[in-house]
């Protein structure tokens, strides 16, 4: 969440940032936070005065008793009792204000960096790089018309999966429901090969591998910002009050909740392979066909914790890492800098990676790489101690490297030939075969 210091000292900047994100009633939300904080501070000021007064009376009581002034001592005791009652009331007012303030701050999103483009929707996202051509200033999703084509009709991955017996969508419906496919034979082997390839590449890049739980408590969900913002999209086990994770970002980042790191140990670089679970309420049509949008899927996540001074450099390294994976998989891609209106609730800046599906005639998102500035760290109380022994909030960053479903779809669709489906060279050591036929 945003810090009170930022909200109170740079109020106009915060309001403008929230408006850039198209957050409704930005000014009212900020003013409410300031008003609640004022109530809290006023209660604290009154409480401090009462405690000081009570301390003064307490000191007098002993002196009066020694002097034999029992009546005056009893009167002082009565005053102390009144002050204690007033102090208890103020403690309650202050605690309620703090609780209300925290709850309210959790409903206010992060503010975007200056370099985040203006815009209200995906059409306004800026294309900053592509494997297809040089990008020009003004290139956006809305006006981008460059796509790969070889002039041959291509089958979509759901037809290829059936043709080569790789994925059974109907069997998944029988076992669980829509959005839970069953991978079979070389389809399962391809999935496992990608997981091993992505983890191996992350290890080479210096990431420490983590194997976290796939269920988390509410505190973890609040720490990274999925709660309360995305509660409706998460699977919740009410009996135990636990949530299935939508991404490894949640458990891996929460490792550092309520932790003070040493600056010399930064950046922290972790990666994790997990199953991810998302309700995806409201999705329909071509968005959910085949592997396009699932309720359960495999993903490798990279997570970094860094200092404010070095987080932009960390972000650049993460972007380069994800781009390198797409190059090795020989997939046509483009990189988008998301506009304010299309950014997530918690991010300060985000880049999406998309690969093109000729068979579907559309771009498919395969990764988002975000810098959250201090937004998550403030919720998590994730801090570091610098060389001067000063404790400060860290910056947190994460990204998909990569999410498997659409990568599998792209590999099947882009590499189909008359003889079968060609496996990208970088994957062959992991699959053990060069063709699916």
Which residues are covered by each model-predicted region?
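N-terminal alpha-helical targeting/anchoring segments
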Residues: 1-141
